[in-house]
Amino acid sequence: MDLQLPRGTRDILPEEVSKWHFLESAFNKVCENYQYEEIRTPIFEHTELFERGVGDSTDIVSKEMYTFLDKGGRSLTLRPEGTASVVRAFVEHKLYGEVSQPIKMYYNEPMFRYERPQGGRQRQFTQMGIEALGSDDPSIDVEVISLAMEFFRKIGLTNIKLVINSLGDKESRLKHREALVAHFEPHIDEFCAECQVRLHKNPLRILDCKKDHDNPLIQSAPSILDFLNEESVAYFENVKKYLTALEIPFEIDPTMVRGLDYYNHTTFEIMSVEEGFGAKTTLCGGGRYHGLVKEFGGPDTPGIGFGIGVERILLALEKAEINIPETKPLEVYVITAQPEAELKAVTLVNKLRQNGISAEKDYLKRKLKAQLKDANRKKAIYTVILGEEELQTGNYQLKNMETGEQEAVSETTIIEKLTNTKEEK
């Protein structure tokens, strides 16, 4: 019997959770400042949702999904990405009928893909993301990008670069598609079997192929930017203009198509340029989509969003040697100098906690010296020592563990002192 972790998963142990809380808190605050509201969707959906939404020519749908039949014979899939589920919820709950548009949502949820596990990439991973539905104004494209850049600034990741592209509207993409087929078809036997299937199904996917990315034919492929019609050019120019106005530097990569079929117009990636982490490690990716809501049975509604892999961000922070703040410190450790003080320790710890003060005590009946060591290990700011004299007088020894200062004070004074200290901070 194998009782170890399944390959591609990991436990997040208590000493690591503070890092996750730090990222989650930073992301939530940035999203709320931009007026995005949280949405939570099911871990599994009907398989067809991802086949139609993500695209059956993508690696995600063709090779990476965790799909199973339930007891009723229905095909279900653990969600591999966030956008399809959010758009499904938008349609199912008729959020397109809301007076206040666009509808702006964020999520932070586990995703599942059957991939080869490696640094920053697991089979169960956590993705933070946002979706803005209901506006086709290029300024909201820039808002979405700006939000992502602000999140990275907030957590201290500044050694990054923004890369953008435009896939244009439907007309522009059809012309580009024809040019790609004409370019690749005479040499398609030089490509992998998957790319040969993609040629007439979705030739854009060839540009995104992991196996053939070094093939010179990909580098010499027709650029989408040469096929943008007047409307698409104007849209992309506005995106660039707004980014420049916000002083957000960017590069343009006409080969960047992203790994999903639903994108049009603006696509973007934010990459790490941290030495030793990989010059092209993508930390965030997203783009605009105009047909997804209609594909799911709703009205023709534009949208834009992005996804950020939390595990990859944690790895980037580690490589950049950025220290993540620790969790809320232990404020008081109550120490019992004799067994008779145990009852008072229990009630004092409880009262401190009820007053919003983090408190801890010994539960192993250790000696005074061992309790002090435990308080040090837990990085307690103060200790309260309960001995025979303290029980008789009702004044307890409150010790500042950093300065070593110690004073005899009442229970009420301890609570007032620590509460005032918290308010001053």
Swiss-Prot record:
One of its GO terms (biological process) is histidyl-tRNA aminoacylation. One of its GO terms (molecular function) is transferase activity. The keyword Thylakoid does not apply. It catalyses: tRNA(His) + L-histidine + ATP = L-histidyl-tRNA(His) + AMP + diphosphate + H(+). One of its GO terms (cellular component) is cytoplasm. Its EC number is 6.1.1.21. The keyword Ion transport does not apply. Pfam families: HGTP_anticodon (PF03129), tRNA-synt_His (PF13393). Its main location: cytoplasm. Keywords: Aminoacyl-tRNA synthetase, ATP-binding, Cytoplasm, Ligase, Nucleotide-binding, Protein biosynthesis. It comes from the Bacteria. It is found in: Cytoplasm. CDD domains: HisRS-like_core (cd00773), HisRS_anticodon (cd00859). Coiled coil: none annotated. NCBIfam families: hisS (TIGR00442). Homodimer. Belongs to the class-II aminoacyl-tRNA synthetase family. This is Histidine--tRNA ligase.
